Amino acid sequence: MSVTAERKAQIIKEFATAEGDTGSPEVQVAILTERINNLTEHFKDHKKDNHSRRGLLALVSSRRSLLDYLKKKDEARYTKLIGALGIRR
């Protein structure tokens, strides 16, 4: 369910705005999206896992907040990010 260190490093490299960037909204949203996708796959087999479902809702809420922040600060970066991640909004 969790994101491996190798996959996380790959995501950071792909979405970083500068060398060593791990905290930009783009990187955070990309990592959250990976975690959300992993949990969504988990729920296909474990439909009654309500404890993890609550965690999924928290992740979605965090991602939504970061996306709202990014849209408010720089709409071009926001549009590029949701296009790259395939998030509908």
UniProtKB/Swiss-Prot annotation:
Disulfide bonds: none annotated. The keyword Ribosomal protein applies. Keywords: Ribonucleoprotein, Ribosomal protein, RNA-binding, rRNA-binding. It comes from the Bacteria. One of its GO terms (molecular function) is structural constituent of ribosome. GO terms for biological process: translation. One of its GO terms (cellular component) is cytosolic small ribosomal subunit. The keyword Ribonucleoprotein applies. SMART domains: Ribosomal_S15. SUPFAM superfamilies: S15/NS1 RNA-binding domain (SSF47060). One of the primary rRNA binding proteins, it binds directly to 16S rRNA where it helps nucleate assembly of the platform of the 30S subunit by binding and bridging several RNA helices of the 16S rRNA. Belongs to the universal ribosomal protein uS15 family. Part of the 30S ribosomal subunit. Forms a bridge to the 50S subunit in the 70S ribosome, contacting the 23S rRNA. This is Small ribosomal subunit protein uS15.
